[in-house]
Amino acid sequence: MLAVMRFLFGTDGSPGAQIALDFLCAMPLSNADHVSVVTVPVYSFIGTGVVPEGPDLLRDRGLDAARAIGESARAALATNGVPVSLDVRNGPVVEALEMVSIQDAADVVVVGSRGLGVFTGVILGSVARALARHASMSVLVVRERRTAPQRLLLAIDGSQEAWAAVKLVSQMPLPSAAQITVLELPASPNACHWPVMDEVRVLLSAHAIEARTAEDGHLAEAILAEARAVGADLVVLGSRGMTAGSGVLQGSLADQVLSQAHCAVLVAKPPMKPRLVTDGPAIARIAIAL
């Protein structure tokens, strides 16, 4: 049975966001999948002048620019036949993306690694980093590659976070020829162990799988080195956040890999408990499903 995936694509129209858009467009999405495109207006006083209409001009320009960016992404994704909706939100970017992801039941949030607008950062964009560290949903951070991943590195231990990563990969729309290298990490003594490789072979049976084992030591360096060795174009690992985790796949490790990887990184989060979501004043809904 074909898994149905719901993606949320956060864009600011920057070069980094365009790379992420090309990556998402290249994936073999079906008409059963869904993508929510989310943009957040960025307001600038440049050119408004000191006139009574200044605030209105500022708001209108920001909204128009955000809609144009979002509509361009929506049109690009729609050419592949996948259902796409557009949502323009006000407020802090990370909060807006997480709010929409919860409301739309998104499986994965897709962003560029860095950009020229609200995603700008020194090495890794501030929004991408904050989502991977603190958000409750899984996050795919795309770097230079603009085509669908063909060689995945899946880092696992015996934890719930690793299980979330394996399950997410099994549901992802990947090319049929994609190969998966599974890197077993030394399990934490406190991990809730499960027969990891048996489950991997069952859930990922549609793809060629190669199993490798990491030695004790600096695990982030081991993951990064293995990713380079196998020519990975996507690294997948689980994480519960910066302050929690039942195994070695804790937030600090995911953060190191995300910051230093040469390729795209998918940080999988365990499913969260159901929660009631309402729009707050800081994240007012402007438009949806245009």
Task: Show which residues each predicted segment covers.
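Helix-enriched interaction subdomains in cytosolic or periplasmic regions
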Residues: 2-3, 9, 103-136
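Structural alpha-helical scaffold elements that stabilize or flank donor/cofactor-binding regions
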Residues: 100-102, 131, 145, 228, ...
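Aromatic/hydrophobic pocket-lining residues that form π-stacking "cages" and hydrophobic walls in ligand
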Residues: 24, 73, 97, 131, ...
